Curated annotation (Swiss-Prot):
Monomer. Associates with 30S ribosomal subunit, binds 16S rRNA. GTP binds at S126, K127, I128, D129, G179, Q180, T181, G182, V183, G184, K185, S186, T187. Zn(2+) binds at C260, C266, H268, C274. This is Small ribosomal subunit biogenesis GTPase RsgA. One of its GO terms (molecular function) is GTP binding. One of several proteins that assist in the late maturation steps of the functional core of the 30S ribosomal subunit. Helps release RbfA from mature subunits. May play a role in the assembly of ribosomal proteins into the subunit. Circularly permuted GTPase that catalyzes slow GTP hydrolysis, GTPase activity is stimulated by the 30S ribosomal subunit. Pfam families: RsgA_GTPase. It is an enzyme of class 3 (hydrolase). The lineage of its organism: Bacteria, Bacillati, Mycoplasmatota, Mollicutes, Acholeplasmatales. One of its GO terms (biological process) is ribosomal small subunit biogenesis. One of its GO terms (cellular component) is cytoplasm. Its EC number is 3.6.1.-. Its cofactor is Zn(2+).
Length: 306
C-alpha cells in the first residue's frame, strides 16, 4: 500500500496527495478501516473521531477495481475536532480589529483551547485600515501584552499590508487558518494563494457577524508547506477543561505560581497570598486576561458534568 496526505473531503470523495509521486488522486474510504492504529499525544484511548478521516491525515491506500481505497490511517501527532484537522504544526489565529469587533474574551478562549492542544499559535490581526490611527495605537498597546508568549502580525489583506512579513512562517509547516467567522481568513488566503478560487463575502450588517465562506476544511500547497483553510465558527466551549486544571493553561499565570502560598494548588480566585493576584495588582497581568479567566472558571463550574 502507498502513503498519501489527505487534502480535502467533498461529497464522499477524499482528495489525497501521494507522498512519493506527489500526484493528487480521488479516493474513497474502505467500508471499515482495516488497520486503525491511531494514537495521539493528546489521548490514549480510542474515540469516535478515530474512525473519521481528517484533512491532514496520513493514510495508506491501494487501487482496487479501478478505485483508490483508503485502507487505514497512520498515527496522528495531534488533531482538532472543530475544525476537523490532524497533524498540525501551528495555528494561524486570525482576528479582525473591527467588523466583527475585536473581543479579548474570544482571544483568550481560543488561546486557552489551543494551549491545551499543545499547538503553536501565531496571532494575526486584520482590517487595520478600518481603525482610526489613535484607536489603532490604543489597540496595539493593549495587545502588546500577548507578545511575551505569542508571535503576531498586523495586516490589511486587501491592500497587502503586512503580507510579505507573514509568508515565511508557512515554510515546512502545516498551518491551520482559524478564527471567528468573517475576520478575513478567506481574503488572506486568496492574497497568499490567488488561484485558491475562494469566494469572500461581506459582513452581514444586520447581524454584525460573518457569513460562512469556507464549507469544508481544505489543504493547500504554499511556500514549501501547507495551509489548511477551515470553516469559520464563532462558538467555543470549555467542556474538556475542569476547574482544577484550567489555570495550568495560562503560561503568563504559571510564571507567578511560585509566589502563591498554596503553590500549584492555588486557583487564583479567593485565596490569600496569591502570586497571580499580586502580579495583577502590580500590572504584570492584563486585567482583562484575569477577568476572562474568572469568567471561564464560572462557565466550567456551570457545565452539566460539574
Amino acid at each position: 500500500m502507498e502513503k498519501a496526505l489527505v487534502l480535502r473531503f467533498l461529497a464522499g470523495v477524499y482528495y489525497i496527495k501521494d507522498l512519493e509521486t506527489q500526484i493528487i488522486l480521488e479516493a474513497k474510504k474502505r467500508g471499515k478501516l482495516k488497520t486503525l492504529v491511531i494514537k495521539t499525544t493528546q489521548k490514549e484511548n480510542s474515540s469516535a473521531s478515530d474512525f473519521i478521516i481528517k484533512v491532514g491525515d496520513i493514510v495508506l491506500y491501494e487501487l482496487s477495481c479501478d478505485t483508490y481505497l483508503i485502507q487505514s490511517i497512520l498515527p496522528r501527532k495531534n488533531e482538532l475536532k472543530r475544525p476537523n484537522v490532524a497533524n498540525i504544526d501551528q495555528v494561524l489565529l486570525v482576528f479582525s480589529l473591527v467588523k466583527p469587533n475585536f473581543q479579548f474574551l474570544l482571544l483568550d478562549k481560543f488561546l486557552l483551547i489551543l494551549e491545551q492542544q499543545k499547538l503553536d499559535v501565531v496571532l494575526v490581526f486584520s482590517k487595520i485600515d478600518l481603525l482610526e490611527p489613535e484607536n489603532f495605537k490604543t489597540m496595539q498597546q493593549q495587545l502588546s501584552y500577548y507578545q511575551k508568549f505569542q508571535h503576531f502580525y498586523y495586516i490589511n489583506s486587501k491592500q497587502k499590508i503586512g503580507i510579505d512579513a507573514l509568508k515565511h512562517i508557512f515554510a515546512n509547516q502545516i498551518t491551520v487558518l482559524a478564527g471567528q467567522t468573517g475576520v478575513g481568513k478567506s481574503t488572506l488566503l486568496k492574497v497568499l494563494i490567488p488561484d485558491a478560487q475562494l469566494k469572500t463575502q461581506e459582513i452581514s450588517e444586520s447581524l454584525g457577524r460573518g457569513k460562512h465562506t469556507t464549507k469544508n476544511a481544505q489543504l493547500y500547497d504554499f511556500n514549501g508547506g501547507f495551509i489548511v483553510d477551515t470553516p469559520g465558527f464563532s462558538k467555543l466551549d470549555l467542556t474538556t477543561f475542569s476547574p482544577r486544571t484550567l489555570k495550568n493553561f495560562y503560561p503568563d499565570f504559571l510564571e507567578h505560581v511560585c509566589d502563591c502560598f498554596f503553590g500549584e494548588s492555588c486557583f487564583h480566585l479567593q485565596e490569600e497570598k496569591c502570586g497571580v493576584k499580586k502580579a495583577l495588582e502590580n500590572g504584570q497581568i492584563l486585567p482583562s486576561r484575569y477577568q476572562n479567566y474568572v469568567i471561564f472558571c464560572e462557565e466550567i463550574k456551570n457545565q452539566p458534568k460539574y
